[in-house]
Amino acid sequence: MTNASLDDLDRAILKLLKKDARLTIAEISNQLKKPESTVHFRIKKLQERGIIEKYTIIVGEPIKPRKLALVVLEIDMPIIEDFLERYIEYVTKTLSGFSEVLFVAKSGKEKIVALVGGESEESLLKFIEDNIESIPTLRNVMVFPISEIKKGDEIAGFLAEV
């Protein structure tokens, strides 16, 4: 779905709900100075079109990780190339099982990218060393500690496991 299929009212509704999904239809209609029936209809259509998939929460400071690192894993090409895809699937499932691993994605043919969180830089690096760098047949593990988030600070709170 592209932004072109959204008009200004749809975008305004989405912006408000993104900021606070607890808003009632009455509150949204008051803020946008539109009838409640219009807002209700638009939200229903946004849901039917799959633009609004679900309503969720972003956990706050007491729960979300204090330190983050982006980790890029390069997988060694196995002798039998057909095993690469299965091994990457195994590694991504293994990483996904850790609560410290907030996000896992495949990048290209031989790389996996993960966002990892921890309470302190020391615990974060120890987790990476003990649980990620120890995975067999990795050619390289690059760790990029995140010192400051410029946009998307809520992502860790959204991804954090409870």
UniProtKB/Swiss-Prot annotation:
Residues 25-44 bind DNA. InterPro entries: ArsR-like_HTH, AsnC-type_HTH_dom, HTH-Siroheme_Decarb, PF0864-like_C, Tscrpt_reg_AsnC-like, WH-like_DNA-bd_sf, WH_DNA-bd_sf. Gene3D superfamilies: 3.30.70.920, Winged helix-like DNA-binding domain superfamily/Winged helix DNA-binding domain. Keywords: DNA-binding, Transcription, Transcription regulation. Pfam families: AsnC_trans_reg_3 (PF22482), HTH_24 (PF13412). GO terms for molecular function: sequence-specific DNA binding. Residues 6-71 form the HTH asnC-type domain. PANTHER family: HTH-TYPE TRANSCRIPTIONAL REGULATOR PTR2 (PTHR43413:SF7), TRANSCRIPTIONAL REGULATOR, ASNC FAMILY (PTHR43413). This is Uncharacterized HTH-type transcriptional regulator PYRAB09690.
